[in-house]
């Protein structure tokens, strides 16, 4: 919803807002912010708030400006009612007022506009898993999960229930639209699902979701971890991304796989044909690759309606448009880059008329099906060699993202205790 400056001033006064967070994500999807006082809002809207971007946005070694996207106004509900805190997601500009080319949120918006010009409407949603761990007397995290519950368990086996409920209520109060939540397969493992919305809103929701989960978990005496594979013998935590693409108000994925349209087949083919190339962005940690192939986590580049382990799954339900779910990503990804990659890959498939091979029910064990990269090191190489990746993200972002990932790989190889290295980095 668009808010004029007058609307914002009235909202701030009526809700006793005393603090405004100007929020953005760094290159790797980590939430960053500068807080301003309400009296500075006019300057933020008209001139922008300057900040030193060195070290935060890897491709930038300069001062930049933050300007609020006023449509993203949201109250942070865990702060007191008196002296409330709100946040905006921000647009990034150079000091001369020109758009900053490394603004990944803007880049996703431009991809959305490109789809719209071609006659397509797109919505995206997420299902994101996380673990809750106990904390010690000092409030520091332990590696002890908060319960021994399993899939869809209820209390008393599910000791996450109250925390999960508070997270959902906070998300709803912020306007982030969670739909369902449950206990997952692992001890202390949870999942919260979001309603589909436009890709930019979905990425904003995912970016802020992690902050909300960690904040509410801490208030309940737990530590929330999005580490992709914290336990060797338990399910990992992934980020499943739903895409619903329409043309002429009809889903290109039909209402069942039997009426999957040629455009829908080409869109899926586009993603499958490029998935290896953008895995560095969707799975940017050493630990991400330990999750692949364990239980329901995909390891091969296949698609299906019926089985639960493909990379891309067709989703059909009564009264709903057909959609697809991309299943390999994890919460450490930058959602703006990852969502842009998925949309761009799918549209490239349509533009090139790419054919979708028939392996609807192929299992992960089928050696004839290509695999996802086996390591972050392999993913880096594939991204650097990819013409698709270079045409989708700015060269400076690719260079610095790859360099940072390579530093991570080098540090891992030098680590005396690889497991301790991963926990220190990703837990």
PLM region spans:
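ATP/Mg2+-dependent ligation/transfer catalytic cores
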Residues: 1-181, 202, 222, 337, ...
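Core alpha/beta catalytic barrel or barrel-like domain that forms the active/cofactor pocket
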Residues: 124-134, 143, 174-194, 224-242, ...
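A generic structural motif
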Residues: 26, 93-99, 156, 196-202, ...
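Catalytic-core signal marking the mid-to-C-terminal active-site face
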Residues: 208, 215-216, 222-223, 246-298, ...
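Short, hydrophobic beta-strand segments
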Residues: 88-94, 190-196, 243
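Flexible loop/turn segments at secondary-structure boundaries
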Residues: 27-32, 97, 132, 187, ...
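Active-site-proximal beta-alpha loop/turn segments in soluble metabolic enzymes
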Residues: 144-154, 187-202, 231-236, 248-253
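Short, contiguous, pocket-lining structural segments
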Residues: 155, 159-163, 180-186, 198-209, ...
């Amino acid at each position: 919803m668009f808010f004029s400056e007058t609307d914002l001033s009235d909202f701030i006064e009526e809700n006793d807002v005393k603090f405004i967070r100007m929020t953005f994500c760094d290159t790797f999807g980590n939430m960053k912010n500068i807080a301003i006082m309400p009296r500075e809002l006019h300057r933020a809207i008209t001139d922008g708030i300057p900040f030193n971007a060195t070290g935060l946005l890897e491709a930038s070694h300069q001062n930049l400006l933050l300007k609020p996207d006023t449509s993203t106004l949201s109250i942070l509900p865990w702060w007191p009612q008196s002296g409330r805190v709100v946040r905006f997601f921000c647009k990034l500009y150079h000091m001369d007022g020109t758009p900053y080319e490394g603004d990944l949120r803007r880049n996703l918006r431009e991809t959305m506009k490109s789809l719209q010009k071609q006659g397509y409407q797109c919505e995206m949603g997420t299902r994101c898993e996380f673990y809750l761990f106990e904390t010690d007397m000092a409030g520091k995290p332990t590696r002890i999960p908060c319960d021994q519950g399993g899939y869809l368990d209820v209390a008393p086996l599910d000791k996450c229930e109250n925390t999960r409920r508070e997270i959902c209520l906070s998300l709803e109060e912020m306007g982030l639209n969670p739909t369902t939540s449950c206990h997952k397969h692992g001890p202390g493992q949870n999942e919260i699902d979001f309603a589909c919305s436009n890709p930019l809103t979905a990425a904003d929701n995912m970016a802020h979701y992690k902050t909300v989960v960690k904040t509410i978990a801490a208030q309940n005496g737990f530590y929330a971890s999005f580490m992709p594979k914290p336990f060797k013998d338990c399910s990992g935590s992934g980020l499943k991304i739903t895409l619903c693409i329409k043309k002429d108000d009809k889903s290109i994925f039909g209402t069942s796989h039997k009426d999957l349209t040629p455009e829908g087949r080409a869109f899926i083919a586009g993603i499958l044909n490029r998935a290896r190339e953008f895995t560095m962005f969707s799975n940017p940690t050493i630990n991400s690759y330990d999750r692949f192939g364990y239980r329901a986590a995909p390891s091969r580049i296949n698609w299906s309606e019926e089985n639960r382990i493909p990379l891309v799954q067709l989703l059909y339900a009564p009264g709903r448009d057909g959609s697809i779910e991309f299943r390999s990503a994890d919460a450490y990804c930058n959602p703006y880059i990852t969502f842009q990659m998925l949309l761009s890959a799918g549209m490239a498939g349509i533009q090139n008329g790419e054919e979708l091979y028939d392996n609807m029910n192929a299992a992960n064990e089928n050696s004839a099906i290509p695999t996802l990269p086996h390591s972050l090191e392999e993913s880096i190489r594939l991204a650097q060699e990819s013409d698709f990746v270079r045409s989708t993200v700015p060269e400076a972002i690719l260079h610095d993202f790859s360099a940072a990932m390579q530093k991570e790989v080098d540090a891992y190889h030098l680590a005396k205790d690889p497991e301790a290295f991963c926990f220190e980095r990703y837990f």
